[in-house]
Structures are given as structure tokens and as C-alpha cells.
């Protein structure tokens, strides 16, 4: 599978200001595979060290930060001869060894020619628990589940992958009949690499669902492993409640919907853990669409989305025929699945931090707001071809400086006040509005 982040890794390798790299991401999004494949393609050899339950290597880091001694230990561990500019050293599961994280500072200062890449699944939590982060001494990249474009490329549709990111609305509209079924397929399979690989191996959607169910179980075990029993119970309850929140017309996360009498203070630390582990995206409400958006965010009002649309379908046991073919009884949750997909693409494909807006004293709501370099995008999401946009129109009239965008299954069209962009063409930001055209 081709991952878009490979190009960023090559840029890192060739940068004259290269520092040790930290590749962040939730468990099972493909960090280990990507780093190994990167090393195979672009280095003479790879020295791979997994620090999870690796007592021998953890002891070496505990002894101090003598770089020559650590490199010797790496060679003994891997059997590889390590040379600057030729070898990629991979320190996997670095969150399991805090001293290894600290050592990156010394690799930066004393061995800048050695390419060291660390991968961490729960790194945000490790840092917040008191581990010294090597500020200013590392480069960092984030890896997410496969985007729709990456999924297209992986399924033998590389041409379509390029098309949906192109600035050619006429061509995109012409091939909607070919792209739309692939998008519905992505809704079911999602972007977890192992689930996608299982589907590709035999072409059976149920193979992907089996992997998704296993990943969901693994995630809950992770919660139980890293939190106290009480904290884990609260975190898992919040996690399991996400589909029911997204299935409501008002998708704002309400603690009282988790359990009768539930209080925010009991669940907040668990939600923070889920966010730092990369398992959820917290979409905060903003009070006004000013630049930048973040000062207007309200931490007390938010929506929670999962990291992957396929996992959301697995959590609610959506049948493949329902997702691929549609169903009258699927109409309400279809909106939740579509918003999950859009949120995921905004983060992984576009690099945005998504927010949302809702009126204080009325039912008006904008599904997502995103900040470009010099623009705010007000985004409405439609699961099919329903193009009524009452809330978006009112919001645009009140805030004429925003770019109004509607994502739907309908083809690209431009009106005097907004643009409709097909859901599968989200990567083509040039279609969104003025900023992309400059």
C-alpha cells in the first residue's frame, strides 16, 4: 500500500536540518510498516528495535546517553552494521521506554548524521505523564488511517486517486458513476491498513469486518491496560457511547447520554486519554468564525468522532448490504457515517483541525468549520443529493467573509454564495473556494 506520508519521510531524509523523527499515531494505523518500507526503499539497511517488553534494550537506555555505546547495543540487538547516512534506525513503541524518548535529544546533538526514527502509539499520554520530551531536538509527523485517496490507490484505482484531487470538476463529475461505489466501499472497509489488506486479499467485505472487530477489542484492552479500573470503565463507556451520540440530530456529546446521572467530571479524563491516544477526534464548538478559529473554541461543547469510518460501522454492526446498497431504515445513521468520513478526511487528507458552530438560541448549526491559510470554510455535509442548505445560507449571510462549502453525493456546482463539492472530491481543495484558486 502506498501511504501519502512516504513523500514527507523522503523530505525528512534529505533535509539538511534533519533531526531524529517521531512518527505519532494511534495503534494499528501502519506506523511500523511505513517506517520499515521507507527504510527498505531509501536506505542501505534498517536496524529495527521494538522497545515493548524489551528488557535488554530498556536497560541500555537506563544506563545513560552515551551515543557510541547505544549504537553498539543497537548493532548487537539487530545484527546490522549501523552507518551514518546509510542506515535507518527504527525505535518502535518508544512510549514504553521514557529514557529512549529522552535519548533523541542526544542523537540530535551528537550524531546528526544518523537517521533515527521513533514510532509511538500513546506518545501524547506518555509526555503528559511526566516524561521529558526533547523539545526542539526532534521532527514529528502524524500518521492516520488511510484516506479515501490512499484507499483508491490500494484497491488498484490509482487514476481515480489522482482524479479526486485534481482541479477538474468536469472530469470529476463525468466519472461519478465509477467513484461513488468505491466511496461506499470505503465507508464499510475504512482506512485501517490491516482491514483494507484483508479485504483486498480475497475481495470479501466480511474479512475487513473481522479485523475491525479485533481492532476494537484491542483498543478496549489498551484502555484497561493503561488506566485504573475505574478510569477505564468511564473511558470505555464514553467510547462506546460515541455512535449513539453521532446518530442523534444534535451530535453534541452529552455526558447524561452515557448513563443516567452521568457527570462530566467522571468522564473527562477518560475522553482526554482517548483523544491523546489518537482514538477520537474532538471537534469543539466555536462562538464565531474569526481568524484564527482556536481562540473562539468552547472546550465544554464538543462532538466526538472515531479515528476511522470503518470502525464506526463495525461498532454499530452495520451490514455490508446496508452501507453499499443503501436502505430506507439506514437514512438517519447514514448522516452520522458521512460526517465521520468528512471529519476523517479533513484531518488526514487536508491537515485541518475541524470545529463546528451552533446557534445559542435556535436550531441552526454548521457541521464543520476549518481554517485555511487566510480563509474560514463553513462546511455542510449531506449524505446523498439533498441540496437544501438553510443553515449554511443563513450563516453565510451573517458572516459573508467565510467560504461556504457543501459536501454531498451531487456533482460539483458553483452558486453565487456557495460551492457544492462531491464527497469523494474533498482532497481537491481548489474546488472549495477562493483560497484554493489563489
Task: Label the model's feature ranges.
Residues 1-16:
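Pre-Walker A adenine-sensing motif
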Residues 31:
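Conserved lysine of the Walker
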Residues 34, 38:
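Hydrophobic positions on the alpha1 helix immediately C-terminal to the Walker A/P-loop
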Residues 90, 115-121, 142:
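Structural recognition of the conserved hydrophobic beta-strand(s) that form the central parallel beta-sheet
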Residues 116, 346, 366-385, 404:
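Conserved catalytic cores of phosphodiester-cleaving nucleases, focusing on short active-site segments
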Residues 127-247:
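Interdomain motor-coupling "hinge/lid" segment immediately C-terminal to the ATP-binding subdomain
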Residues 197-365, 369-370:
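Accessory nucleic acid-recognition modules appended to NTPase machines
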Amino acid at each position: 500500500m502506498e501511504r501519502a506520508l512516504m513523500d514527507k519521510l523522503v523530505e525528512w531524509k534529505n533535509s539538511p536540518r534533519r533531526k531524529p523523527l517521531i512518527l505519532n499515531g494511534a495503534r494499528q494505523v501502519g506506523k511500523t510498516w511505513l517506517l520499515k518500507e521507507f527504510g527498505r526503499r531509501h536506505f542501505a539497511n534498517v536496524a529495527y528495535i521494538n522497545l515493548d517488553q524489551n528488557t535488554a534494550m530498556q536497560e541500555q537506555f537506563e544506563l545513560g546517553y552515551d551515543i557510541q555505546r547505544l549504537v553498539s547495543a543497537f548493532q548487537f540487538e539487530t545484527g546490522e552494521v549501523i552507518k551514518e547516512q546509510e542506515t535507518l534506525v527504527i525505535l518502535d513503541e518508544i512510549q514504553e521506554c521514557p529514557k529512549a524518548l529522552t535519548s533523541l535529544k542526544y542523537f540530535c546533538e551528537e550524531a546528526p548524521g544518523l537517521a533515527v526514527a521513533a514510532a509511538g502509539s500513546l506518545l501524547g499520554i506518555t509526555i503528559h505523564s511526566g516524561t521529558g520530551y526533547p523539545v526542539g531536538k526532534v521532527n514529528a509527523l502524524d500518521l492516520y488511517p488511510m484516506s479515501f485517496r490512499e484507499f483508491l490507490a490500494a484497491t488498484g484505482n490509482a487514476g481515480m486517486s489522482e482524479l479526486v484531487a485534481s482541479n477538474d470538476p468536469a472530469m470529476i463529475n463525468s466519472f461519478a458513476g465509477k467513484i461513488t461505489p468505491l466511496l461506499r466501499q470505503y465507508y464499510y472497509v475504512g482506512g485501517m491498513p490491516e482491514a483494507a489488506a484483508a479485504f483486498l486479499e480475497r475481495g470479501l467485505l466480511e474479512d475487513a469486518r473481522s479485523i475491525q472487530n479485533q481492532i476494537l477489542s484491542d483498543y478496549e484492552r489498551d484502555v484497561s491496560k493503561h488506566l485504573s479500573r475505574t478510569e477505564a470503565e468511564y473511558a470505555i463507556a464514553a467510547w462506546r457511547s460515541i455512535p449513539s451520540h453521532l446518530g442523534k440530530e444534535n451530535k453534541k456529546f452529552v455526558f447524561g447520554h452515557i448513563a443516567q446521572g452521568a457527570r462530566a467530571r467522571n468522564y473527562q479524563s477518560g475522553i482526554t486519554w482517548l483523544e491523546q491516544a489518537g482514538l477520537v477526534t474532538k471537534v469543539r464548538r466555536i462562538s464565531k468564525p474569526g481568524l484564527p478559529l482556536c481562540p473562539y473554541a468552547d472546550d465544554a461543547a464538543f462532538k466526538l468522532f472515531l479515528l476511522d469510518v470503518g470502525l464506526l460501522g463495525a461498532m454499530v454492526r452495520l451490514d455490508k448490504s446496508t452501507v453499499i446498497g443503501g436502505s430506507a431504515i439506514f437514512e438517519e445513521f447514514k448522516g452520522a457515517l458521512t460526517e465521520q468520513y468528512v471529519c476523517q478526511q479533513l484531518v488526514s487528507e487536508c491537515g485541518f483541525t475541524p470545529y463546528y458552530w451552533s446557534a445559542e438560541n435556535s436550531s441552526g448549526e454548521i457541521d464543520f468549520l476549518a481554517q485555511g491559510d487566510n480563509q474560514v470554510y463553513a462546511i455542510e455535509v449531506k449524505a446523498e443529493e439533498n441540496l437544501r442548505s438553510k443553515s449554511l445560507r443563513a450563516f453565510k449571510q451573517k458572516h459573508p467573509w467565510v467560504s461556504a462549502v457543501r459536501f454531498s453525493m451531487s456533482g460539483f456546482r458553483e452558486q453565487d454564495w456557495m460551492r457544492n463539492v462531491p464527497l469523494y472530491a474533498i482532497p481537491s481543495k481548489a474546488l472549495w473556494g477562493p483560497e484554493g484558486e489563489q
